[in-house]
Amino acid sequence: MAQQINLEVVTPSGSIINKDVDIVNAPGSGGDFGVLANHAPLLSTIKIGALTYEIGEERNTLMVSGGFCEVSNNKITFLVESAEAKQDIDTDRAMKAKIRAEKRIAKHGLPSDEAYSDTRAEAALHRALIRLRVAQGL
């Protein structure tokens, strides 16, 4: 059996995952990256996206929100705002959030003081699209 790296995903609610895995692929703010056993130490910010990990032939996917990642001593730890396993994502809710966000973005002639609201709508749309992508296994 190949060497493994310990993966831990922590949210404000507590530890979501703590297991040995073969490989981790993460959505870093500077681009996606992969980590295997014995990886060099690394710190990275994490953006909203799909975090995947493999154990043997089994591939698992989580939707993670923003946070941080540390690789050290054959362990990779993610501290993220939220994490949802593929099977836990409510696709109906995600689709409704996508539609709401698209409607907010589609409004024209927003006053300048609503620019913040528009940015929030874009972030909500991005989260909904990632949830749907993870739920559909893409």
From Swiss-Prot:
One Gene Ontology MF term: proton-transporting ATP synthase activity, rotational mechanism
Which is a Pfam family this sequence falls into? ATP-synt_DE
The protein's matches in InterPro entries, at most eight in alphabetical order, are given as: ATP_F1_dsu/esu_C_sf, ATP_synth_F1_dsu/esu, ATP_synth_F1_dsu/esu_N, ATP_synth_F1_esu_C, ATPsynth_dsu/esu_N
For this UniProt record, give its keywords in alphabetical order, as a comma-separated list.
Answer: ATP synthesis, Cell inner membrane, Cell membrane, CF(1), Hydrogen ion transport, Ion transport, Membrane, Transport
Q: Is Membrane included in the keywords of this UniProt record?
A: yes
Family the entry assigns: Belongs to the ATPase epsilon chain family.
**What organism is this sequence from?**
Desulfotalea psychrophila (strain LSv54 / DSM 12343)
Function summary: Produces ATP from ADP in the presence of a proton gradient across the membrane.
Relate the assembly described in the record.
Answer: F-type ATPases have 2 components, CF(1) - the catalytic core - and CF(0) - the membrane proton channel. CF(1) has five subunits: alpha(3), beta(3), gamma(1), delta(1), epsilon(1). CF(0) has three main subunits: a, b and c.
One Gene Ontology CC term in the entry: plasma membrane
Q: Where in the cell is it found?
A: Cell inner membrane
Q: Quick check: keyword Cell division in the entry?
A: no
The entry's protein name is: ATP synthase epsilon chain
Gene name as annotated: atpC
Its record classes its membrane topology as:
Peripheral membrane protein
